[in-house]
Amino acid sequence: VNHKNIKTGPIMAALLVAGFVGLFSETALNIALGELSQIFGVDATTIQWLATGYFLTLGILVPVTGILMQKFTTRQMFMASLFFSIIGTVLAAVAPVFSVLLTARVIQAAGLAIILPLTQNVIFTIFPPNKRGGAMGVMGLVILAGPAFGPTLAGMILDTLSWHWIFWITIPFLLFSLIFGYFYIPNVNETRQVSIDILSVVLSTIGFGGVVYGVSVGGDHGWTSTTVFGTIIVGVIALILFAIRQTKMENPMLNLKAFKYPLFVLGLAMNMITFLNMLSMLVVLPMYMQMALLVSAFATGLIMLPGSLLNCVFAPIIGRLFDKYGPRAVITPGTILVVIGYGLYGMYGTETALWIMVVTHIVMMLGIGMVLASVQTNTLNALPKQFYPDGIAITQTSQQVAGAIGIAVMVSLFSAKQNGYLTDVANDLPAAAASGSSLVFKISLIFAIVNVVLSLFMKKPK
């Protein structure tokens, strides 16, 4: 790729705005689920599908994008992504019944499933290795800001307008992205004749779909129920068969040779732990603040805002530090901040001052910001160029699956501990919620400590 005549600014703007909207939509609806279950007259388990369905679609489609990026041009993939995003968003905004809204969510997620891997692939193609950290830092900002701002902005919208506006508000941004992309995005990938192996797609769908589905409904059906246990087992078996098939094929759907690179595997593990912890925290923390500290949804969003904002300010700086000093200088201090954050969260009860929550969240988000983009950059830098599409598909899929598992398991533990407290200790809901979140944050703390240890083995790929 000739780096001279490529206008990186407009290209990044088009890709990142579309990515931001997709990730914003991923979490923005969570705050409206209670209201929507009443409007559509469906129960809490059913309404949860608006979130689960989104995750499930990502888990199923992202593995396939690795091969699609080799079959279709960058521009074709970009246009397809925006087509899905815009159609899905408009359909969601006008949805008269639950089934239409759910369908719209799946179409929206399809758009995001394409744009995330595509953005990473374009960054790794249009930026030379010494500038990738900075560019990935900006992408990391978007990956964190989208889900983090979702609940805050949605809370404001729900207070003033109706839930439809959670969708309408994003349309101008998607149109901006479409126009910029149309004029500026070049074809950066070399396409080749790839035949898509149907059996691989089926195994991957059953595999990732089964695991994400099984884990997502675990809390409702009980972890030992046949539905949950069965779908997870079937999913795992399908994934094993999928992996075996990939290693035997000449042109695999997902090239697993990426796993031969130790730094890639190390980064992948750290990335999964970070996502498992982060996405479950973004769900459990608002539950703790609303149930134990009794603050409104809107106030919860405001408490979490400074951490998210500072993260946006620091993301590009962290990226430049990574480019200059290498991975360990940024990642290890970041993992230590995350450990401090979870250690503090685990000690909070029903009397915690709100300013303490703000400060802790800032520490936490800074730590995550230092870890996330840097780990992703280093993980992919460990691979030769021809493995980028596969490496990206593997990282993106594993983080979606880890996030889905994190949310499902941590919310289940939160509820179980909370209910146990109510029956065994006292009928005191705030204290029960605090005991539930405390358990979750202590478990997350253990994962966070594992990440500190793993970060010590991080180094710059040769």
Model region roles, listed by residue range:
Residues 90-91, 156, 209, 213, ...:
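Alpha-helical transmembrane segments of multipass membrane proteins
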Residues 181-185, 214, 420-424:
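Transmembrane alpha-helical segments of integral membrane proteins
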Residues 189-190, 205-228, 243-248:
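Phenylalanine-glycine-rich, low-complexity intrinsically disordered regions
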Residues 2-3, 130, 178-205, 247-262, ...:
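Flexible interhelical linker loops that connect adjacent transmembrane helices
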Residues 10-24, 29-33, 40-53, 66, ...:
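12-transmembrane solute porter fold
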Residues 56-60, 90, 144, 148, ...:
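Hydrophobic/small/kink-forming positions within alpha-helical transmembrane segments
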Residues 422-435:
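Short, membrane-exposed interhelical loops at transmembrane-helix boundaries
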Residues 62, 66-199:
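Helix-loop-helix hairpins in multi-pass membrane proteins, especially solute transporters
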